[in-house]
Amino acid sequence: MLDSCSGPNYCTPNPNCSGQPAVMAVSGSPVITDNNFTLTANQLPLNEWGYFLMSESQGFIPNVGGSSGNLCLGFPFYRFNNASNGTGKVLFSGSGGTFSFSPDLTNLPQNVTFMIGETWNFQAWSRDCKGSTSNFTDGIEVMFR
């Protein structure tokens, strides 16, 4: 179970087509060498696609790119959506409205490397069933050791 290196969730998400806002959770260990860390997005629209994002900084851009949600990360941010090189994959929320991903902390997007003592922020993006739009979860920060 993740210890106190995980801060509280931040950045209020907008409700998606389920009527609920989607929320982030993390589990596992913030110890980089353990390589046992899982991101989970809950209360997503059913049967929709999405992926996780990360950034060293927090931000707030409402309805970014015409979405129904708020981007809670600062720039630059990185996407866990490239299955071809093992740094991520596009995920499916299924009938439970949730998806999880356990990144390889030694093979992060765009050659990012987590350093001991750094704080990183995570958020999930997903399609929303309200027409041709998308939405985001809230954000969560984690200090790695």
Q: Where in this protein do the model-derived segments appear?
A:
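Residue-level hotspots within well-ordered secondary structure
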Residues: M1-R145
